Structures are given as structure tokens and as C-alpha cells.
């Protein structure tokens, strides 16, 4: 596919950029369609995204767009595509650009121009009577847009600032072919069925309340799931030579100034005043881990020190960005901070990567790796950053691991290796990270005494496996569609007495399972067995159902139905041994 670039040239697109350009052009065509249907609409931003495209629209007073209006907008978009309008591009000096946008009543574009650097190039793309300020590139003719669909509408503040006006965000998807679009729409339908918010309600895992937006409540079943995950985390970290610490939730502002968070992260932090002194609720665990290291002298013989922490952190997120467990304002982070000598660095990074790999294999996740380099807003010298990035590269190459470089996406204090999981729907989630930090040991004057009795500065590694525990739980819910493996399932077995005659026997069986350490529930309600089975399978999503009628009472055995709907008869002892083996091996 050829594209029109903002210098006026037309060139063949690299294959990996085709979808992005199609989506960007779809956003312009959607805006043109909306302008035809709602002539007084003003437009803010309309980019392509990893998942589709959107445009933020300011509609006239009293006018609203809902999903009911999508067929009309899509029909107008198809007209524009059929008209096969040519995309053209031109550049204007700042004054002329402002005049053009003012003449067309595009107040948001005028404000955006004012935010640009004085020497910024200002280019416009036009198709038919629609003009949009844009850097491109775009398709050459509207007919090149073959497959698109509008998918949702929501609110979004102008520039993401809650003090600004709330605009209407219209989302869509676009692909090169109808087959790709159909496949994507099927995936979206499947994603709706797997929505962790829906499954979380059905399985009594967690809830959200208006009284605490962005702060999840975990229910009893959710706590079983969460604690089972944490038990697994503690077991594998103990085996890998980690110790566990816990650091305070609230620490004074000076600590965060020393760490660099106050200068680089304060907009995301909550603060309070205690005894006339300003304190911050921690957004990250690392400064607390540094204070633990600094609390006593260290010898080179003690290193590496691997200190893990399941720490509760709080980060301010805009209310409109909150989304179930995926985007919250407080969460538990499975951090660990490693303090190492230079000669230990590569082996420690390799050890961390292998640990993270073992975790993701346990849950059946494929993943790819990115090396994220220095961002614009960062601290430290060029030399330190070069050393840090080289240290991560060396470890990845020693592992023989393929990776992509993600320029400018490192943490403010150091570069990082990011792990992007692929779930059962093919979606990717950034979870695990390994970050190399020369800055915090310098800022806090961390030291150890080397073999030659001189004081040296340790290198610090920050790393997480799950990332946010809450977010990882959300990912697991959708990955497994609530059908967790036996070891992880909040309810591992549900006993279903067919009638009152088998109720006592069902309770006897449950007692044996409970005594063996199996999580079992007895559904002894006076309901038809078919209803109980459907609920256990579709709502509770249990690994095993025990269907217990008069036949089982007489034989003293149980009928076991698994998720394949296959039913087999076995003794209670056989079943207990089977389930315990699955729990032990985390199969």
C-alpha cells in the first residue's frame, strides 16, 4: 500500500505500518462523516492507537452521539469511501495555520497550534471539503479504506485534564481486509464474554464502588485467589534466595525528593500533612527498599541482596481512565530490589529473567521482550545510562533472547527490560520488568565494603514478575475466562446432591475433602439438579462437580464431572488423591 507523507511524497508503506496508517485515515474519514451529519461539531484529537482509532468531538449543546447513531455515521463514511476522495497535504506558517483553523471554527486546533514549538512544521491533510491538522502519513485515496467498524463511545477531557471540558470520544477499528476485521470483531465479542468485571461479579471475586473510585474491594473468593497467587510468589522467591521485607505506606516528602520521584512523578502521587510536615503515600516501593539496605553497613560478601516486597502503592489516575482491575488507583506490586556488585550484574539479570519466564510458563503465557531506553524526563549522566543499557543488553544476549528496542520508554531512573504477555485472545499486556538503576544508590549514598577494604557503590536492580497483583488477576480472569486451573480456583469442587435423600451423603463427602485441604462447597439448595449443574459450570466455573444421587449413596462412591462434561465414577479417596496432585504440581 502506498501512503502520502507530509512532505508531499508518495511511497510504499513498510508492512508493519500499514494498519496504523489505515486507522489514522479512518479517524479522518470518520471526522468528515460526523462533520457532514453534525456541521457544528468541533474536533480535538483523532489518532490511531494499538487497538484502533478514535476522535474526541465537542458537540453542540443538547446534541449527543450514542451507539445508536453509529449506523448513520458508518453509512456516511462508506459514502466518502465510495467518492474516492484524494488526500492532499500542504504546510502553512504558524500565523496562516491559526487563521485557517479560526476561519473553520476549529478552536481546539488553534489551541493545539499555540502549544507547538515556534519552529514546528504545521501540516494539513485534506480530503474533499474536510481539512485536518496532521503530521500523517495517510492513504492516498479514501477508497483504500476497505474495512472499518465503530465500536464505542465514551467521555474524555480535553488534553486529559479534568478541569477542561468533557468531550465525546468515538472509537473504531479498521483493517486492510474484511477478513481481518471479522476476526477482530469475533475477538471483541469473545473479550466481552471474558470481561473480568463481569466474571468478577458472577464469581464474587471483587467489586468496585462509587464511594471509592479506582480502589477495588476483594471479596472472599477473590481473596482466596489473591492469597493463592501470593503463596506461589513467596514459595518461588524463597527458593530463588530472596528475603521478604515490608516498608511503610507513608513517608515524608524529603525521601521522595531524594529518590527523584518528587521531581519526575509528583503529579501521580497523593500527599498529606502530618504534624505540619508534608508526607506522601508511596507510589512505588523502591525508596523504602533503599532505606532498608542503608540501615546497616554491608560487606561485599553479603551481595547480592535480593529483597522482595508485596507493597501496596497508590497512584493518581484520572477517573475517566479507570477500568476494573486493569487501571486502578491502589494496587499491590510484587517488587524486589537487588543490590549487586558489578561482577554479579549479568548473572543476576539472567536469574531474574529466568524466574519471570518460569512464572509466565506456569500460567501458559507466551511473551515478547522489549529493551526500553532513556526517556526525555530522566535523571543521571549519559555515561551511567549507557552503562545501564549495555548491562541489560549483555544479559539478554547471554540468554539468547530475541528483543525489540523501545526507544525512550525507560523509567526516569534507568533503562528496563519489559515483558509483554500474550493472552488466550492474542492481546498483549506489559507486566514484568527488570530495571537497572545507578541513580538511586548515588542519591542515597549506598555503599558496601569491598575485598580491598574500600567503599564501593552497589548497583540496584528493580524487578516485578506479576507487576500489579490486581491487574494480573484481571488478566488471569480473562485469559482463563474464569475457568482457573484447580490449584488457583477459589472453589475447586462443588458437591451437588440430586435430592434431599443424598444431602447428608454430600455433606459427608465435603467434610472428607475439606479435611484433605480441598476447597469445596456443597450446594444443598432445593433446586433441580440441572439448574445446579448449569450454575456450577457457567457461573462458578468450578473445575469439578460431584453429582451425588441415591446410586452414589448406595455404592459409597461419587460421580465426578470435569470441565469437558465427562462424568466418571470413582471412590472419594481416588478423587482426593487426584485433586491433591493437581494442587501440589500446580497443573
Question: Where does each model-flagged region fall?
Answer:
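NTP/phosphate- and nucleic-acid-binding module
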Residues: 1-42, 50, 56-587
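Conserved P-loop NTP-binding catalytic core
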Residues: 45
Amino acid at each position: 500500500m502506498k501512503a502520502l507523507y507530509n512532505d508531499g511524497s508518495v511511497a510504499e508503506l513498510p508492512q508493519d505500518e500499514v494498519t496504523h496508517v489505515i486507522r489514522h485515515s479512518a479517524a479522518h474519514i470518520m471526522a468528515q462523516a460526523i462533520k457532514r451529519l453534525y456541521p457544528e461539531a468541533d474536533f480535538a484529537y483523532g489518532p490511531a492507537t494499538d487497538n484502533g482509532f478514535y476522535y474526541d468531538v465537542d458537540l453542540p449543546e443538547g446534541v449527543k452521539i450514542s451507539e445508536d447513531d453509529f449506523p448513520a455515521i458508518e453509512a456516511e463514511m462508506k459514502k466518502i469511501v465510495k467518492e474516492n476522495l484524494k488526500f492532499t497535504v500542504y504546510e502553512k506558517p504558524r500565523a496562516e495555520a491559526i487563521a485557517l483553523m479560526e476561519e473553520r471554527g476549529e478552536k481546539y486546533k488553534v489551541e493545539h497550534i499555540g502549544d507547538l514549538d515556534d519552529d514546528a512544521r504545521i501540516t494539513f491533510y485534506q480530503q474533499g471539503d474536510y481539512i485536518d491538522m496532521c503530521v500523517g502519513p495517510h492513504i492516498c485515496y479514501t477508497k483504500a479504506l476497505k474495512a472499518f467498524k465503530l465500536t464505542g463511545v465514551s467521555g474524555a477531557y480535553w488534553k486529559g485534564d479534568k478541569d477542561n471540558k468533557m468531550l465525546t470520544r468515538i472509537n473504531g477499528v479498521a483493517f486492510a481486509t474484511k477478513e481481518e476485521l471479522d476476526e477482530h470483531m469475533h475477538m471483541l465479542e469473545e473479550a466481552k464474554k471474558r470481561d473480568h468485571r463481569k466474571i468478577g461479579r458472577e464469581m464474587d471475586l471483587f467489586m468496585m464502588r462509587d464511594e471509592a473510585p479506582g480502589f477495588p474491594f476483594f471479596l472472599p473468593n477473590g481473596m482466596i485467589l489473591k492469597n493463592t497467587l501470593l503463596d506461589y510468589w513467596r514459595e518461588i522467591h524463597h527458593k530463588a534466595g530472596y528475603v521478604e521485607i515490608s516498608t511503610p505506606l507513608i513517608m515524608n516528602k524529603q525521601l521522595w525528593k531524594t529518590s527523584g520521584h518528587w521531581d519526575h512523578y509528583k503529579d501521580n502521587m497523593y500527599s498529606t500533612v502530618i504534624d505540619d510536615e508534608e508526607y506522601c503515600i508511596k507510589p512505588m516501593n523502591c525508596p523504602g527498599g533503599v532505606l532498608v539496605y542503608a540501615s546497616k553497613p554491608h560487606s561485599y560478601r553479603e551481595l547480592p541482596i535480593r529483597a522482595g516486597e508485596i507493597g501496596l502503592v497508590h497512584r493518581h489516575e484520572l477517573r475517566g481512565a479507570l477500568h476494573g482491575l486493569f487501571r486502578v488507583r491502589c494496587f499491590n506490586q510484587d517488587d524486589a530490589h537487588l543490590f549487586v556488585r558489578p561482577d554479579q550484574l549479568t548473572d543476576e539479570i539472567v536469574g531474574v529473567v529466568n524466574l519471570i519466564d518460569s512464572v509466565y510458563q506456569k500460567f501458559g503465557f507466551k511473551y515478547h521482550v522489549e529493551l526500553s531506553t532513556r526517556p526525555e524526563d530522566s535523571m543521571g549522566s549519559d555515561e551511567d545510562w549507557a552503562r545501564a543499557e549495555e548491562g541489560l543488553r549483555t544479559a539478554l544476549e547471554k540468554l539468547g533472547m530475541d528483543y525489540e528496542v523501545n526507544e525512550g520508554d525507560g523509567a526516569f531512573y534507568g533503562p528496563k527490560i519489559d515483558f509483554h504477555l500474550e493472552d488466550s485472545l492474542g492481546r498483549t499486556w506489559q507486566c514484568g520488568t527488570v530495571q537497572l538503576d545507578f541513580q538511586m544508590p548515588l542519591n542515597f549514598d549506598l555503599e558496601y565494603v569491598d575485598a580491598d577494604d574500600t567503599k564501593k557503590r552497589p548497583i540496584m536492580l528493580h524487578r516485578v514478575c506479576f507487576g500489579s497483583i490486581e491487574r494480573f488477576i484481571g488478566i488471569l480472569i480473562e485469559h482463563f475466562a474464569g475457568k482457573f486451573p484447580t490449584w488457583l480456583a477459589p472453589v475447586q469442587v462443588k458437591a451437588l446432591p440430586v435430592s434431599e435423600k443424598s444431602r447428608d451423603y454430600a455433606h459427608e463427602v465435603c467434610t472428607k475433602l475439606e479435611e484433605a485441604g480441598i476447597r469445596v462447597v456443597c450446594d444443598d439448595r432445593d433446586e433441580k439438579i440441572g439448574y445446579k449443574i448449569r450454575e456450577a459450570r457457567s457461573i462458578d466455573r468450578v473445575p469439578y462437580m460431584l453429582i451425588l444421587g441415591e446410586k452414589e449413596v448406595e455404592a459409597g462412591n461419587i460421580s465426578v464431572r470435569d470441565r469437558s462434561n465427562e462424568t466418571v465414577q470413582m471412590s472419594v479417596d481416588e478423587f482426593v488423591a487426584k485433586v491433591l496432585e493437581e494442587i501440589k504440581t500446580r497443573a
